[in-house]
Every structure is written in structure tokens, then in C-alpha cells.
A protein has these predicted regions:
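Acidic, metal/ion-coordinating pockets
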Residues: 23-373
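Bacterial N-terminal signal peptides
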Residues: 11-19
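Bacterial N-terminal signal peptides that target proteins for export
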Residues: 1-10
């Protein structure tokens, strides 16, 4: 029995989800340029296959980062991103245009998003607390740039929309490759801009009725697996909150297969709920942060397999810890590297204090969260 059929049977007797204003899609939508990414059609059954989907932490652009060329920022993790079938990044900034700015109201150059795409990120998450830093006009321009990049860079985005119809198309975002059909749900607890709720364009909020509607649409579109990517939790806390576990339990009961969260800017603990993996927060990917535990983050690689009978299942997720070194530490720029590759490479560091800070933080976060790589 396939996972989709099993989910349908198991859903009998569960609490019914709220109705949604979005009508069922008669044909699953697919971006035309994804045809190039998917390649030639292959038989659904008759051959074994594996799909990899890698999620990296918060991609930020503080004011000081703008003083440096982007090149080294993600170069150390780009090979892992590029080798994945899909790589996902939380774009924690707007593309609101000039004047460019960092914290507390982020507006990055368009070239920064293009750089992320060059590094292998092909799905941008936009539901975060900073997406309205430049108001509705800033969000509208951000969406406009990402829509252009869909055509020019063959990327996708989710987490925000220009109107209700666009929301139904992007929430969930359906991605397809190798005969797998994956649904992505990206939403945020809120934004830093008050008074804009209910206006368009809009970001997707952490509202159970909306989430349930997105899960319904994922099932209508015959999703093999549903992945939730929430922006939630308490900043700088290494353990999940009560509200996180309550929502996680509810989402798993509703049909979500795996949860990978962001927002706290640190790695949080993980768990399984009914056998489904939950990563409450994977921390930062690149930023100017240097407070305790904010320089370490994770990439989580999700693997989905299909056997020769056509049966699909999720394999054990793979975790890789990363370290974001600031200028003058590892090199003269920002540089995110994979920790395990650098544990015995003290000679690479310009400033040895950062090397030892990386080793201490790596050990402490693993022991505190229980998340091992």
C-alpha cells in the first residue's frame, strides 16, 4: 500500500479539518521550467530510485555582510546543496529595493538571491518575521523578483502570495521529480510589521485552519509526502517550546510526514512523533551573528526511496553541522563550512580563537539538543 493510500485510510476518524476557500485543483500545477529539471519522463514503477531534499538554515544579510563579496559565504556548503535533487533555504530578508539595509528592517540586493541560487538553492522560503520589514510594497517587490527568477533561474518560492488564487497555487508548493510528488508547507508565527494582517500581498500565517487547508490540497494533489517548514519557536533557546510540540503533534496527526523549523537562530532539539521526524530549528546558515550558539547551524537531508514495486518510503534523515565564521577568523570574509571537515584543520584558521569556539559550540549544542551528525 502506498503512503498516500495509507494516509487516506488513517484519516478516517480524525478531526475534520476546516473548509478552505480554495477549490480542488483538477490538474496538479507544475512550473514549465521544472520540465528541464525533471528531465525525460521515466516509468513510475519498474525501477528503484531515491530523491534527496536538503534544507539549510536562515540565510541572512546584515549590514556588515554587505561590505563583503558574497562568493565565500556559502561556498563551503554549496556542493551538498547542488548535489541534492532540491535544496531549500529560508530567505530571511526582503528584496525591497534601495536603500539596502540590515537589521532591524532587512532589504537585500536582488543579486543576493541570485547568489543563493548559484550555490544550489532552488526553493526559497519567504514566510518569516522579516518578510514585511519594508511593508506591503517591499513584499510585492520581493515576490516580483522571485517570480522573475522562476523564469530566469529555474527556482521556486513559497511562503507568500499576491492574492488568494496565488496562495492556493503556492500553499502547498508541489515539487515533482523522479516520480515523487512532494508538498511543501511554509508559514510563520507572525511578522515584525503590525497592522498589515489581512492585506495582499501576504505571507502565510501559522493558522491551523490555513494549515489544514494546505494539507487537504496536498492530498488532493496526490502528495507522496508532506513536509512542513514552520517559522516558529523562541529565539536563542536550544529546546523547543510547549507551543511548538503541540503544533507539531497536531500537524503529524493531520498528515504531515516531516517537520523542519526555523526562526530561533540556534539549533534546537529534535524528536519523532508517531515515527515522523521533527527538527524544531536548524539555526543559521550565514549571518553576522556571534552570540552564543548562533554561528552553528545544520543542513538536514531528507531522503525518499521508491522500490521496484512502486512503494515509497522516507529514509533516515541525515544531519550535517555547519559553522559560520566571521571576517578575520577563518579567512578575510564570511565563510560557512561543514564542521566535521574542519575539526582537525586548525591550520586553516587565521584566528585560532574562532576554531576553538567552533569545537566548543559543536560539542555543547550536540550534548544539549541530542542532535548528532
Amino acid at each position: 500500500m502506498t503512503l498516500s493510500k495509507a494516509r487516506t485510510l488513517l484519516s478516517i476518524g480524525l478531526l475534520s479539518v476546516a473548509e478552505t476557500v480554495c477549490s480542488p485543483a483538477r490538474n496538479p500545477d507544475i512550473h514549465p521550467l521544472m520540465i528541464e529539471r525533471i528531465g525525460k519522463a521515466r516509468p513510475l514503477y519498474g525501477e528503484a530510485d531515491t530523491l534527496t531534499l536538503t534544507v539549510i538554515g536562515d540565510i541572512m544579510l546584515h549590514s556588515r555582510q554587505m561590505e563583503y563579496p558574497y562568493g565565500p559565504f556559502l561556498a563551503g556548503v554549496a556542493p551538498r546543496l547542488r548535489e541534492a535533487d532540491f535544496a531549500i533555504g529560508n530567505m530571511e530578508f526582503t528584496l525591497g529595493g534601495e536603500p539596502y539595509s540590515g537589521y532591524p528592517a532587512f532589504s537585500a540586493p536582488d543579486s543576493y538571491a541570485e547568489y543563493a541560487a548559484e550555490c544550489g538553492i532552488d526553493i526559497f522560503l519567504t514566510a518569516n518575521n522579516h518578510i514585511l520589514d519594508k511593508g506591503l510594497k517591499g513584499l510585492a517587490r520581493t515576490i516580483e523578483v522571485y517570480e522573475r527568477m522562476e523564469d530566469e533561474w529555474n527556482v521556486r518560492f513559497t511562503g507568500s502570495a499576491v492574492n488568494e488564487e496565488d496562495k492556493c497555487r503556492r500553499y502547498p508548493l508541489m515539487v515533482r521529480k523522479k516520480g515523487f510528488n512532494i508538498a511543501l508547507l511554509n508559514f510563520t508565527y507572525g511578522t515584525n510589521a503590525g497592522g498589515l494582517s489581512g492585506s495582499w500581498p501576504a505571507t502565510f500565517r501559522m493558522n491551523r485552519e490555513d494549515i489544514a487547508g494546505a494539507i487537504d490540497r496536498a492530498e488532493e494533489k496526490m502528495a507522496d509526502f508532506i513536509i512542513a517548514l514552520p517559522h516558529w519557536g523562541n529565539e536563542y533557546e536550544l529546546r523547543h517550546s510547549r507551543s511548538q510540540i503541540e503544533l507539531a503533534e497536531w500537524m503529524i496527526a493531520e498528515g504531515v510526514d516531516v517537520i523542519v523549523g526555523s526562526h530561533p537562530h540556534v539549533v534546537q532539539d529534535s524528536c519523532t512523533i508517531d515515527g515522523k521526524p521533527v527538527f524544531f530549528s536548524i539555526g543559521n546558515a550565514v549571518s553576522n551573528m556571534s552570540a552564543a550558539n548562533t554561528q552553528i547551524g545544520m543542513t538536514v537531508t531528507l531522503k525518499f526511496s521508491r522500490d521496484r514495486n512502486g512503494d515509497k518510503r522516507m529514509l533516515e534523515p541525515e544531519v550535517t553541522y555547519n559553522w559560520c565564521s566571521l571576517p578575520g577568523k577563518l579567512c578575510d570574509n564570511y565563510s560557512t563550512v561543514e564542521v566535521k571537515d574542519c575539526l582537525e584543520c586548525r591550520e586553516r584558521w587565521v584566528n585560532e580563537t574562532d576554531y576553538y569556539k567552533m569545537k566548543r559550540t559543536y560539542t555543547y549544542v550536540k550534548e544539549t539538543t541530542g542532535v548528532s551528525d
